[in-house]
């Protein structure tokens, strides 16, 4: 696109959009849910979901939350995220370990902590955002299984289209980004795959199994 790139880091806490995009400190917010209500978004550049992560030597494979083998297990879950609803629905919250949702990510990473707790057998499995889980498992070369969580009827959805956030006052910029995303779709997909991000097709099936 022939424009200079500068990265701006800011913890994703209350006031994130106001203090970054709204304050003119950046022109693009990566990795936001398409159709976000607090900013305009580009066309989606990938489709992903929450996942369940567990050790490959655990002696069980996840199929669904009705599996009676899950009852005694200790699950990790980021507080306030959609998978917590699934644990409640299936009576699995009693042994759950909550991890903080809103933290200063410059100093803390609850998702990375959860992944390490699974690897260290401090908990049996974790439910967390797929791109974070996939990245930490891949970069840490950990022997963990990452499985996409299916959405259930009358429950919060697990899968989301991911886009980039822009200011509402910059429609031409949004169109330029959309054109670039379309042109470089295959390269973007290859990078996401390399980083371990679980990708789905429009039928919610994994693109890479």
Region locations from a protein language model:
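Flexible hinge/capping segments at coil-to-helix
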Residues: 55-75, 89-90, 94
